[in-house]
Amino acid sequence: MTMVEHYPFKIHSDFEPQGDQPQAIEEIVEGIKAGKRHQTLLGATGTGKTFTMSNVIKEVGKPTLIIAHNKTLAGQLYSEFKEFFPENRVEYFVSYYDYYQPEAYVPSTDTFIEKDASINDEIDQLRHSATSALFERDDVIIIASVSCIYGLGNPEEYKDLVVSVRVGMEMDRSELLRKLVDVQYTRNDIDFQRGTFRVRGDVVEIFPASKEELCIRVEFFGDEIDRIREVNYLTGEVLKEREHFAIFPASHFVTREEKLKVAIERIEKELEERLKELRDENKLLEAQRLEQRTNYDLEMMREMGFCSGIENYSVHLTLRPLGSTPYTLLDYFGDDWLVMIDESHVTLPQVRGMYNGDRARKQVLVDHGFRLPSALDNRPLKFEEFEEKTKQLVYVSATPGPYEIEHTDKMVEQIIRPTGLLDPKIEVRPTENQIDDLLSEIQTRVERNERVLVTTLTKKMSEDLTTYMKEAGIKVNYLHSEIKTLERIEIIRDLRMGTYDVIVGINLLREGIDIPEVSLVVILDADKEGFLRSNRSLIQTIGRAARNDKGEVIMYADKMTDSMKYAIDETQRRREIQMKHNEKHGITPKTINKKIHDLISATVENDENNDKAQTVIPKKMTKKERQKTIDNIEKEMKQAAKDLDFEKATELRDMLFELKAEG
């Protein structure tokens, strides 16, 4: 057992909260202290929401889980929070599959797709670091993707099986080795890596699953621990002496031997019942398949203590009743903790939809004898279960969704940008002669070396408009869903560099399109009600022009819809609040000139910092060249993950898929 140590949260920043940040921080902190369950921070684009969230965490002092809707955003938040809290434990918990194809069965073609997963070692280490941090100290912030609602082992078992070593403790070497094997560490005297230990005489070196380069050297004198030291596993350099060290299990699905025996009996009983059912239905192939697969897994569990796909037996391993709520990361937090949901208008619907998608796929596997029915209990939480497990939540969004609006009595607003930038001016113009009018507006921006985004409703409209603009001599490109990741990033970068002046697209709301050079956003068919022209989508689209001090939006429409009216009124309201603030403090709005980074080194053309060799992708390649490029990108991807630059690693991974698919 380990004791949770208390440390205060300390923010490192050159800035103090300003604008309406202090008020937002105070309101949320008071709400949390008063026991409010739901609060929403309505933060406009560019108002410093992350800084506000950091200050709330510092004031409240509770362990905090921050959920983002994808790995890229989680990676960005992780980097930002790590900068704000260098003295505290900021952890990262996302799905550890670089590439994950879950097992599935397609009955129509009789195709079974094996689980194909390449586990990213760094991310697995970070997951272990996150769970162990929660049992060691209370100043923990975990940034997670929605995968945090997926099943994990029993936290009590995980905590109880910690191997504790202390100087002067009576314990002989073989007892320590036995305990390490019980928590799924393997002995490996040659290839020393995470989750293994090696033995040299009276010295045992352990490489904890939660550490990156640090191993623990335990020295024995007879039946007593004589010395404990932290050592760099590569160089052998002694980093520091320790009086005590807690070694957490190498797997989250760890089970005591006596429990494992009971679990195996339960699995055998379920298998027997299920085989009878299948044979009674004359599903002989399915029965044979299930018997073969399950018996193989059981044999592995008896011999090794685990098997591939052990998570499918989690309901038995944790000795829970069938159909009960699985353990997840949420159970690893104590009684008093906080949840923040970033971009909640996207993240909450994702949390809500996880269970059904997972259930449908697994049901097919169960029906066709690939898995026992209890595999259905290795699942994400249902939304109601998520609600039950969370105590206090803060939703963060520029456009809160219906759930947040319904559950929050008063929105905490953060409208003022410290930079003084205003929300753009909006003009509604009739659709008659709209294209010629649009061309003259673009021309004005081109002369000022500014950029334009044009959003349409259909693919055909986008294509026709792009062709028409090209014929009129405008440097334009079209961004649509079929464009691959690499091309998409190149197009956005080229827009910033001035290779293009205009981008035309249907849904320009995806992350990565916050471009300071854009001074005009044009919305065609603004009066056609629907998902892409809802008040939430319109506000998000308008926000794309809020990073430039000359930002303007033109909506082409023949009537004023409710969504348009709401978006225009809300933007004007925010604009007026910012103007008053600027006047009072003598602030002149100024575009922030963000450096044009290469998200991926493979797209480098003429960046002045590009002095080290990078992977460049030629348009046509021989088989040999393609393989070499794939190898180079693979190296870069692993390095990016090691450097915790998950945004870059994700982009590189997508490039790899594209190259492999083309090959």
Swiss-Prot record:
One of its GO terms (molecular function) is ATP hydrolysis activity. It holds the Pfam family Helicase_C. Residues 434-600 form the Helicase C-terminal domain. GO terms for cellular component: cytoplasm; excinuclease repair complex. It is found in: Cytoplasm. Coiled coil: none annotated. Keywords: ATP-binding, Cytoplasm, DNA damage, DNA excision, DNA repair, Excision nuclease, Nucleotide-binding, SOS response. Its main location: cytoplasm. One of its GO terms (biological process) is SOS response. Residues 30-414 form the Helicase ATP-binding domain. InterPro entries: Helicase/UvrB_N, Helicase_ATP-bd, Helicase_C-like, P-loop_NTPase, UVR_dom, UVR_dom_sf, UvrB, UvrB_inter. Residues 627-662 form the UVR domain. A motif (Beta-hairpin) lies at residues 96-119. ATP binds at residues 43-50. It comes from the Bacteria. The beta-hairpin motif is involved in DNA binding. The UvrABC repair system catalyzes the recognition and processing of DNA lesions. A damage recognition complex composed of 2 UvrA and 2 UvrB subunits scans DNA for abnormalities. Upon binding of the UvrA(2)B(2) complex to a putative damaged site, the DNA wraps around one UvrB monomer. DNA wrap is dependent on ATP binding by UvrB and probably causes local melting of the DNA helix, facilitating insertion of UvrB beta-hairpin between the DNA strands. Then UvrB probes one DNA strand for the presence of a lesion. Belongs to the UvrB family. Forms a heterotetramer with UvrA during the search for lesions. Interacts with UvrC in an incision complex. This is UvrABC system protein B. It comes from Staphylococcus aureus (strain MSSA476).
